[in-house]
From Swiss-Prot:
Keywords: Disulfide bond. One of its GO terms (cellular component) is mitochondrion. PROSITE patterns: CHCH. It holds the Pfam family Pet191_N. Signal peptide: none annotated. Involved in an early step of the mitochondrial complex IV assembly process. Residues 28-66 form the CHCH domain. GO terms for biological process: mitochondrial cytochrome c oxidase assembly. A motif (Cx10C motif) lies at residues 31-42. A motif (Cx9C motif) lies at residues 48-58. This is Cytochrome c oxidase assembly factor 5. It comes from Xenopus laevis. It comes from the Eukaryota.
């Protein structure tokens, strides 16, 4: 289950939960903790790729007129 659901209020921003999970994934990755790299560098190297794709799809679905009827992608 995504971590942002536990003991939190409803997000006001679209895709906020996916963004928070992506941030937590990057900050808890070995790339940041052990190698001391920035989260941006780790994202370029491919860490948390699934959440990155989910966040991109969610942001894209906001702009896609067809997806407005179907609802946003993501959680």
């Amino acid at each position: 289950m995504p971590k942002y659901y536990e003991e939190k209020e409803e997000e006001k921003h679209p895709c906020g939960g996916v963004k928070e999970d992506l941030k937590n994934c990057l900050l808890q990755s070995d790339c940041v903790l052990q190698e001391g790299k920035s989260p941006k560098e780790c994202l370029k190297e491919g860490y948390c790729k699934a959440l990155q794709v989910t966040f991109f799809e969610c942001k894209r679905s906001i702009l896609d007129n067809r997806a407005r009827f179907r609802g946003r992608k993501g959680y």
